[in-house]
UniProtKB/Swiss-Prot annotation:
Protein name: Potassium channel toxin alpha-KTx 9.3
InterPro entries assigned to the protein according to its UniProt record, in alphabetical order: Scorpion_toxin-like_sf (IPR036574), Toxin_alpha-KTx_8/9 (IPR008911)
Stated role: Inhibits voltage-gated potassium channels.
CC terms in the record's Gene Ontology section: extracellular region
Pfam family, one: Toxin_6
UniProt entry keywords in alphabetical sequence: Disulfide bond, Secreted, Toxin
Recorded domain comment: Has the structural arrangement of an alpha-helix connected to a beta-sheet by disulfide bonds.
Keyword Coiled coil in record: no
Compartments where located: Secreted
Tissue localization of expression: Expressed by the venom gland.
A molecular-function term among this protein's GO annotations: ion channel inhibitor activity
Family as reported in the entry's similarity comment: Belongs to the short scorpion toxin superfamily. Potassium channel inhibitor family. Alpha-KTx 09 subfamily.
Record-annotated disulphide pairs: C3-C19, C6-C24, C10-C26
Organism ancestry: Eukaryota, Metazoa, Ecdysozoa, Arthropoda, Chelicerata
């Protein structure tokens, strides 16, 4: 998942989306 889609991708989880080297991470 790209950075721009990260917030939507992580939505619904108690996540704080971060972007590392163009990769989306949902940090719970």
């Amino acid at each position: 998942v790209g950075c721009e889609e990260c917030p939507m991708h992580c939505k619904g989880k108690n996540a704080k989306p971060t972007c590392d080297n163009g990769v989306c991470n949902c940090n719970v």
